[in-house]
């Protein structure tokens, strides 16, 4: 397959044109859009291109089981970005960092977990050092929700309710009167469950995912490329986990913990941005 001709990372991206990533093995256009794959040792990570766009971040007042910190407000992301189609796996982690911190180590396709925000930043720093010209980072909270929603406005990218065939959550606690489902008591290997409409797997459930931002209340005004406050005490977590009720896997759910804390249900997902 012939790779599309892409501009360099320094090319202005106002029109949402995907930028090239040095060292990418190939670019593929499929039903989900454009993707690229990076090789790090024996590990491979696919990234999906998300175009710039505007969306409503947070949840409407009538959304069942919403949290108090989910003020609905308009957000515009003015630049496109590449986002990993899965959480960082243990295989990818071990290709960069020699010690696997995870509790569930029986499958290298499992998401890495038991990771502090600071651990993720050290991993990313080493990854960027090894892959010259690559600018990996954590997603901002706004980028994360934009990617999770994949153009939807419902509580989940799959619709107004979900089952454990779609999301790995504590199935004894379904969403808004839904039927109980499986409680797997552990994370699943990535790509086990269906992708959202933009080709991203397990954005809901499985493991919490760190975001770049310090946690703060949402503003009432429309925002362009929000990045959170400059200082804070807690970093943002998104997505819910295998051990939580379904409500915590909603696209709008926000959580936060201290960046040095290492819960065994927390991992992260990479974004590639222009330097």
What does each of the following model-derived ranges do?
Residues 37-101, 116-118, 205, 274:
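A short glycine-rich, aromatic-capped structural motif
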Residues 50, 56, 60-61, 103-106, ...:
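Functional-site microenvironments in short loops/helix caps that host divalent-cation chemistry
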Residues 36-38, 59-78, 177-179, 185, ...:
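Short, polar loop/linker segments at the starts of domains and inter-domain junctions
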Residues 82-86, 113-116, 193, 259-263:
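Aromatic-acidic/polar surface patches that form glycan- and anion
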Residues 88-96, 122, 244, 248, ...:
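Generic alpha-helical secondary structure signal
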Residues 2-15, 19, 194-196, 229-275:
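Disulfide-stabilized, aromatic/cysteine-rich ligand-recognition loop
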Residues 3, 14-49:
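GGW-centered surface loops in extracellular recognition modules
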């Amino acid at each position: 397959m012939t790779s599309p001709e892409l501009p360099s990372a320094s090319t202005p991206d106002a029109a949402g044109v995907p930028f090239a990533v040095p060292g990418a093995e190939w670019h593929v256009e499929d039903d989900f859009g454009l993707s690229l794959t990076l090789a790090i040792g024996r590990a491979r990570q696919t990234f999906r291109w998300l175009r710039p766009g505007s969306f409503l971040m947070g949840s409407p007042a009538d959304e069942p089981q919403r949290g108090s910190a989910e003020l609905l407000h308009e957000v515009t992301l003015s630049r496109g970005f590449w986002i990993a189609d899965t959480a960082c796996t243990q295989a990818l982690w071990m290709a960069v960092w020699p010690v696997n911190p995870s509790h569930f180590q029986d499958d290298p396709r499992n998401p890495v977990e038991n990771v502090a925000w600071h651990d993720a930043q050290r991993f990313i720093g080493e990854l960027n050092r090894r892959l010259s010209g690559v600018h990996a980072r954590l997603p901002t909270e706004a980028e994360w929700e934009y990617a999770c929603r994949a153009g939807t406005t419902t509580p989940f990218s799959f619709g107004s309710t979900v089952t454990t065939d779609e999301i790995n959550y504590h199935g004894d606690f379904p969403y808004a009167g839904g039927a109980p489902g499986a409680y797997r008591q552990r994370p699943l290997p990535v790509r086990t469950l269906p992708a959202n409409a933009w080709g991203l797997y397990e954005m809901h459930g499985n493991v919490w995912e760190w975001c770049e931002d310090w946690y703060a209340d949402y503003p009432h005004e429309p925002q362009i490329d929000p990045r959170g406050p400059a200082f804070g005490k807690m970093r943002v977590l998104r997505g819910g986990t295998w051990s939580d009720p379904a409500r915590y896997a909603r696209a709008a759910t926000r959580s936060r913990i201290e960046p040095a804390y290492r819960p065994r249900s927390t991992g992260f997902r990479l974004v590639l941005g222009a330097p």
